Amino acid sequence: TYNNNLIR
């Protein structure tokens, strides 16, 4: 996945 902050 990409940046975890974007997923949240």
UniProtKB/Swiss-Prot annotation:
Protein keywords: Cell wall, Glycosidase, Hydrolase, Secreted
E.C. code: 3.2.1.39
Cellular compartments per GO CC: extracellular region
Coiled coil: none
Protein name (Swiss-Prot/TrEMBL): Glucan endo-1,3-beta-glucosidase
Originating organism: Pinus halepensis
Any GO molecular function: glucan endo-1,3-beta-D-glucosidase activity
Domain of life: Eukaryota
Membrane-spanning ranges: none
Top EC class, one word: hydrolase
Catalytic reaction(s) noted: Hydrolysis of (1->3)-beta-D-glucosidic linkages in (1->3)-beta-D-glucans
Main location as per UniProt: secreted
Lineage start: Eukaryota, Viridiplantae, Streptophyta, Embryophyta, Tracheophyta
Family: Belongs to the glycosyl hydrolase 17 family.
Subcellular location(s) of the protein: Secreted, Cell wall
